[in-house]
Design a protein with these regions (language model features):
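N-terminal Rossmann-like FAD-binding beta1-loop-alpha1 element of flavoenzymes
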Residues: 34-63
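Conserved N-terminal/central alpha/beta ligand/cofactor-binding core
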Residues: 2-15, 21-23, 29-31, 55-154, ...
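Second-shell loop/turn segments in exported
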Residues: 31-36, 99, 118-126, 188, ...
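Soluble non-cytosolic domains of exported or imported proteins
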Residues: 40-41, 125-130, 477, 481, ...
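Flavin (FAD/FMN)-binding glycine-rich loop and adjacent Rossmann-like elements that form
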Residues: 12-18, 80, 185-191, 196-519, ...
Length: 562
């Protein structure tokens, strides 16, 4: 039978490796097989996947897994979704030429598919409250230890020298043994996954980082911060009616108040044709909220933004003002609308400050939020609720990953196919940051997990925006779906590493890729692929269901001979 169909038990721990045991001498006051630090959605889902993979692949019937977070979980479990309120999910955007074999939002992994089902997502919108409750129940069912309010005060590392004086294959010079905490004592593990937004654990383990969005001039740059808010008492229909009213006012030269709003928008004030092009369609009808799905809507027109800034006399654009009401992504929740729209100017230094504050808004941001709230209350909203944490889109990235998943690699189609966990397609989105200077790109790329492995610490992975994206790769690397899907492969690699007493980097990524669930074959391609190469890629994707591995790949076994 094909290797992909061999029972998972066949991959079990097997005989003890002749290699020296890489586990630490210092075990801590409480010891776990794996500690996941950070309750971001990718961290939660990876912990759940570890609870499935460690019994199957590592021979641990009752694995000891802990999920640690420095946050106060009374505000919700699930980081960017639960406390930052990100209800409008950025989904994998399957290229149109693949729609004959995949739906437009096909999940990029089985783990992300299970995330959608767990949190009750129909298409785009996830309810932060419902997701938080679902995460809690799932962790309890999996018997994963959940510790909140864990503030690391230090780490304990050991040199990773083998007994014979050499070093283990693929291993860095150190291994992380213990997290020192205030209130929870010394917590040890064989493996650590840092899934926090800013990779605080990796920083404390002395892993070097690439600052900002890359070397040289980009080291001070960051993607804009967002403050998501929820509006009660307004329906999508009422919001469209408001957009239409504002559009007609902006186009009415006799409406002096609306014309005054345009003072801060010289590109519109001095160019009537451009204003028309952005406010109305070819038939002269106002461009209103567009719903591609039943649970979401996207603003096509700047009318609402012009009115919000104009009523308050605020300059638009993050180069002239510290805040901007951007075109909104609206998630339609059962009793409210969630707006991802308010952006704040950001820098790498400020981004680090906000991460250190666990995402709490800075004082200077409050007046802009108050102006937005006042606007919606004046136009029919019953209540505006601000999320307790900012939406943080970026972080400093590990400087020396085993394989950087950079923007350049994404443009070339991603990691080699035999090592690919799956494929992801999305715009490199630097919303409100350096987007004016970066040409638009939407790569369709294969992803692996080795960009999460810093070379300096052999038993640590960094999962999330702080992974090794080589700078601008973070434009896609910040997306929740991609990081959850990477987490599935990382969980498999972790199980194999524990079973064989290997450092994470010594696990063969091709074996990890073969153990990924069927139905998510990679189809990455270089940007600008020809029509013929796209056709060939689609054909190979369809053949994958019959031949899970190819004759030229090591270990291939024909299903005809089964």
């Amino acid at each position: 039978m094909p290797l992909a169909q061999i029972p998972a038990a066949a991959y079990g721990p097997g005989p003890r490796s002749p290699r020296p045991d890489p586990s630490c001498r210092r075990q801590g006051e409480r010891h776990f097989d794996v500690i996941v630090y950070g309750d971001e959605p990718a961290g939660v889902m990876t912990a759940l996947e570890l609870s499935r993979q460690l019994p199957r692949l590592a021979g641990l019937p009752r694995p000891r897994i802990a999920l640690l977070t420095p946050s106060d979980l009374r505000a919700g479990l699930g980081g960017t979704i639960a406390r930052s309120g990100l209800a409008y999910l950025d989904r994998n955007q399957v290229p149109r030429d693949m729609w004959a074999v995949l739906p437009p939002f096909a999940p990029s992994s089985d783990l992300y598919r299970r995330f959608l089902r767990l949190t009750g997502v129909q298409q785009i919108a996830v309810d932060p409250r419902q997701a938080s409750r679902a995460f809690r129940r799932a962790l309890a069912r999996a018997r994963i230890t959940l510790l909140a309010g864990v503030e690391p005060t230090g780490t304990e590392l050991e040199r990773a020298a083998a007994a014979d004086g050499g070093t283990l294959q693929g291993e860095g010079s150190d291994r992380l043994c213990v997290i020192e905490t205030a209130g929870h004592g010394r917590l040890g593990a064989d493996l650590f996954i840092d899934a926090s937004l800013g990779a605080d654990l990796a920083h404390r383990a002395s892993v070097p980082f690439l600052r900002g969005l890359g070397p040289r001039g980009l080291s001070r740059e960051s993607i804009s911060l967002g403050w998501i808010f929820e509006v009660e008492g307004l329906s999508i229909t009422q919001l469209r009616n408001l957009e239409e009213q504002l559009t007609r006012r902006l186009l009415d030269r006799r409406d002096r108040e609306a014309q005054h709003w345009l003072v801060g928008w010289p590109a519109y004030r001095n160019n009537r044709q451009r204003l028309l092009a952005d406010l109305v369609d070819q038939r002269g009808n106002p461009l209103l909220l567009y719903s591609a799905t039943s649970d979401s809507a996207d603003q096509q027109s700047p009318a609402l933004s012009i009115a919000v800034h104009g009523e308050q006399g605020l300059a638009p654009g993050l180069r002239r003002a510290p805040a901007r009401m951007d075109a909104a992504n609206v998630a339609i929740l059962p009793d409210r609308l969630s707006f991802n729209a308010l952006l704040f100017r950001n820098s790498a230094a400020q981004n680090r400050e906000v991460i250190a504050r666990h995402g709490r808004p800075l004082g200077w941001m409050v007046p802009a939020a108050a102006d937005v709230e006042s606007f919606f209350l004046r136009h029919g909203a019953r209540r505006v609720h601000w999320m307790p944490e900012l939406y943080i889109r970026s972080a400093d990235q590990i400087a020396h990953p085993r394989m950087a998943l950079s923007a350049g690699l994404m443009a070339r189609g991603g990691v080699p196919r035999p090592e690919a966990l799956g494929t992801f397609s999305y715009h490199l989105d630097f919303r409100g940051g350096i987007s004016a200077y970066v040409p638009p790109a939407k790569p369709t790329f294969n992803f692996g997990y080795r960009h999460t492995l810093p070379r300096e610490v052999s038993n640590l992975a960094v999962l999330g925006p702080a992974s090794g994206f080589g700078g601008l790769g973070q434009g896609a690397g910040r997306i929740i779906e991609l990081n959850i899907s990477v987490g599935q492969g990382l969980a498999i690699a972790s199980a194999l590493a524990l079973a064989r007493r290997l450092p994470l980097a010594a696990v063969d990524p091709r074996e990890v890729a073969r153990l990924m669930p069927a139905g998510f074959a990679p189809y990455g391609r270089p940007s600008g692929s020809t029509a013929f190469s796209l056709f060939l890629g689609r054909l190979l994707y369809q053949l994958e269901s019959w031949f899970p591995r190819w004759p030229w790949e090591p270990g291939w076994h024909s299903p005809l001979a089964s």
